């Protein structure tokens, strides 16, 4: 199990989940919560699940389960609990009072991990904004709960700085961060516009956290992105050019990983980053085919894409980590294209490239034209933005066979074209 490297104190926690008819598998969700807790530097010493029609509106779990959790806290010398859902301010305050310990929820935990992962100025702005929005509604309970240990999960902002706890100062800081983020978003839109004008198609690499997205981009392009076997190892999007056959190119963008119950504070704060998938021409969905929860993770990814408005695009599903699959292989899921691969070993990646070439061909127009030697500049544009299949030098000019993006087809036609 992975542990976070800037841990101030060891936190021993009890995990709490509520199984309702709407929840598919709370036990698996708590396993994931345990991994999240470990990533943030906490040790899980116990898990409690309550079957209920709905979560308790006042305390998340019922009185009997609260007593059970209190006994576990004492028995295992634990100093906090983490609930598998986002708690309301009232639930957090009441549970903290009943248990007399530090109370956290999945959202607080994920925000804490993001705070430690953010490296760029944009990422730090987005994370701090999400943290402060979450805290602003929970100041009274959080101030008491988080002060119990003087540090640890929930107290750290990006760069290890302490988060603000004064409501007035939080409002001021949120306004400043929103203004900074607006400038960053303008810059991102400018870059996106330049890509569009460059006529290069873009494929967004999406997937559940730790599915192998960064490893895929590194293997394909040598991007040099941090690729660890940890949840949310990558927060900041990275774009690289992938060289394909016949001189064709496509832009690949790595994105932040998705997860069940992704906090809406993060979705809102990371909107400009997540929208890389919305504005991409194609989606490459990386699925960890060795994970027992692969099907549930797939549905989470599709639901998140739907919420982002990133539907209606051609999707390539990569059944990744084939080198780690044991027993019955994962069945092929619905997608326009499905490729079995291992981003780590490179298995299947040539097939992925072939699919990308096919997709590019579908978006291009085939031409056979004779260009005068004075029109060689147009051939250079074809070479740069399309696929130059062949060129034959003749006395009266250069005969070209090529595929070009529809957007530049008219502009690269020779004057002799009728």
How should these model regions be labeled?
Residues 1-112:
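N-terminal accessory targeting/assembly segments
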Residues 20-25, 55-59, 117-122, 161-162, ...:
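Flexible beta-alpha connector loops of hexameric P-loop NTPases
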Residues 126-129, 133-136, 140-143, 164, ...:
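Alpha-helical coiled-coil heptad-repeat register
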Residues 29-38, 70-75, 87-101, 247-248, ...:
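Conserved C-terminal guanine-recognition region of P-loop GTPase G domains, centered on the G4
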Residues 7-10, 148-267, 271-278:
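Conserved G1/Walker A P-loop phosphate-binding module
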Residues 363-418:
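NTP-binding/hydrolysis catalytic cores, primarily Walker-type P-loop NTPases
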């Amino acid at each position: 199990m992975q542990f976070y490297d800037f841990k101030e104190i060891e936190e021993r926690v009890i995990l709490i989940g509520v199984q309702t008819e709407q929840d598919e598998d709370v036990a698996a969700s708590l396993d994931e919560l345990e991994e999240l807790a470990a990533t943030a530097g906490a040790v899980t010493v116990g898990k409690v699940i309550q079957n209920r029609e709905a979560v308790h509106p006042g305390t998340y779990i019922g009185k009997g389960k609260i007593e059970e959790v209190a006994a576990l806290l004492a028995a295992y010398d634990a100093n906090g609990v983490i609930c598998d859902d986002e708690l309301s301010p009232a639930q957090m305050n009441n549970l903290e009072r009943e248990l007399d310990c530090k109370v956290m929820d999945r959202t607080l935990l994920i925000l804490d991990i993001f705070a430690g992962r953010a490296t760029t100025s944009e990422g730090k702005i987005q994370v701090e904004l999400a943290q402060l929005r979450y805290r602003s509604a929970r100041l009274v309970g959080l101030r008491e709960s988080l002060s119990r240990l003087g540090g640890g999960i929930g107290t750290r902002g990006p760069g290890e700085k302490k988060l603000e706890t004064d409501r007035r100062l939080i409002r001021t800081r949120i306004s400043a961060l929103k203004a900074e983020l607006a400038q960053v978003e303008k810059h991102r839109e400018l870059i996106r516009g330049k890509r569009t004008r460059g006529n290069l198609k873009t494929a967004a690499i999406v997937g559940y956290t730790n599915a192998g997205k960064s490893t895929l981009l590194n293997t394909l392009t040598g991007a040099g992105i941090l690729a660890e076997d940890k949840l949310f190892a990558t927060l900041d999007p990275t774009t690289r050019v992938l060289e394909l056959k016949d001189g064709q190119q496509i832009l690949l963008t790595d994105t932040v990983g998705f997860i069940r119950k992704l906090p809406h504070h993060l979705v809102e704060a990371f909107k400009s980053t997540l929208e890389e998938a919305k504005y991409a021409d194609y989606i490459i969905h990386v699925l960890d085919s060795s994970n027992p929860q692969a099907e549930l993770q797939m549905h989470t990814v599709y639901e998140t894409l739907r919420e982002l408005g990133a539907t209606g695009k051609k999707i390539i599903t990569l059944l990744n980590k084939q080198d780690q699959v044991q027993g019955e292989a994962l069945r092929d899921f619905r997608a326009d294209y499905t490729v079995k691969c291992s981003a780590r070993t490179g298995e299947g990646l040539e097939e992925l490239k072939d699919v990308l070439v096919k997709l590019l061909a579908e978006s291009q127009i085939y031409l056979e034209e004779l260009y005068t030697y004075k029109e060689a500049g147009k051939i250079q544009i074809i070479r740069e933005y399309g696929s130059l299949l062949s060129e034959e030098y003749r006395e009266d000019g250069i005969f070209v066979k090529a595929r070009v993006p529809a957007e530049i087809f008219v502009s690269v036609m020779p004057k002799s074209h009728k």
